[in-house]
Regions:
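Active-site environment of divalent metal-dependent phosphoester hydrolases
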Residues: 14-18, 44-49, 66-72, 94-100, ...
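Beta-strand-turn-beta hairpins that frame and shape the catalytic cleft
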Residues: 1-7, 79-88, 128-134, 158-165
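A short C-terminal boundary segment appended to hydrolase-like catalytic domains
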Residues: 110, 115, 121-130, 162-209
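Helix-adjacent hinge/juxtasegments
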Residues: 60-112
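Conserved beta-sheet core of the metallophosphoesterase superfamily
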Residues: 60, 98-166
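N-terminal active-site segment of His-dependent metallophosphoesterases
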Residues: 1-54, 68-76, 149-150, 184-187, ...
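Short secondary-structure boundary/capping segments
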Residues: 29, 51, 77-79, 107, ...
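Active-site neighborhood of phospho(di)ester-bond hydrolases with catalytic His/Asp-centered motifs
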Residues: 8-10, 37-43, 60-65, 89-91, ...
């Protein structure tokens, strides 16, 4: 089936002595292999990370508060249309209970989106609220602001009318446990048809036809 496989990463902080993400292990490279596009939620921190990522696929970045450099692939806000899904990206996206339209007004200047991608917190997040999929892929290198270790990424599979989103753990590193809580969400024609948290299926909303 035609479609786009999109990798989501964010907050790629690296120890000062690390020269490439490969030195943390092969897991991130393996995850990025074969995707069609990479969306980075900001805090690239070190510019060479963008070139490293782009060996796998084109990359688009929402500039983070630690990204004090210019790059044509990076902007404070990004807006993309992929397979009929409108995707907004901004770095500072913190959990809050206000209605999503209020969140979009602040984060995206009121632009309507189907998917809102952010970063900053280093904590994974995946929810469907007020008709919008909200995703924070966490951090692959500094999850939950713990010491440097393997963390989380996310994957979006997009086809017209169908979306599958998943938070993915990169595994454990050097005896350090990964604090990730895996989760996934699947939409068909903007309706949830599957949703899980830490491997447990969640109740689905009831829709009136």
């Amino acid at each position: 089936m035609p479609g786009m496989r999109v990798a989501l990463i964010s907050d790629t902080h690296l120890p000062s002595l690390i020269r490439t993400p490969d030195e943390l292990g092969p897991q991130l490279a393996a995850f990025l292999t074969g995707v069609d596009l990479i969306l980075h939620g900001g805090d690239v921190v070190r510019p060479f990370v963008l070139d490293w990522c782009e060996q796998f696929a084109p990359i688009v970045v929402a500039q983070g508060n630690n990204d004090d450099f210019d790059d044509p692939r990076m902007a404070r806000r990004q807006l993309l249309d992929i397979e009929g899904w409108r995707i907004g990206m901004v770095h500072e996206l913190r959990p809050e209970d206000r209605p999503v339209p209020v969140l979009l007004e602040r984060a995206m200047g009121g632009e309507r989106v189907d998917v809102l991608i952010g970063g900053d917190t280093h904590v994974e997040r995946l929810e469907y609220r007020d008709g919008v999929v909200v995703i924070n892929s966490g951090s692959p290198t500094l999850p939950h602001h713990k010491e440097f270790r393997l963390g989380t990424v996310a994957l979006l599979d997009l086809t017209p009318g169908r979306l599958h989103a998943e938070i993915v753990s990169l595994g454990h590193s050097h005896g350090s446990p990964n604090p990730t809580v895996p989760r996934h969400l699947e939409l068909l024609e903007r309706r949830i048809i599957a949703h899980s948290h830490d491997g447990v299926a969640l109740a689905l909303p009831l829709y009136e036809d």
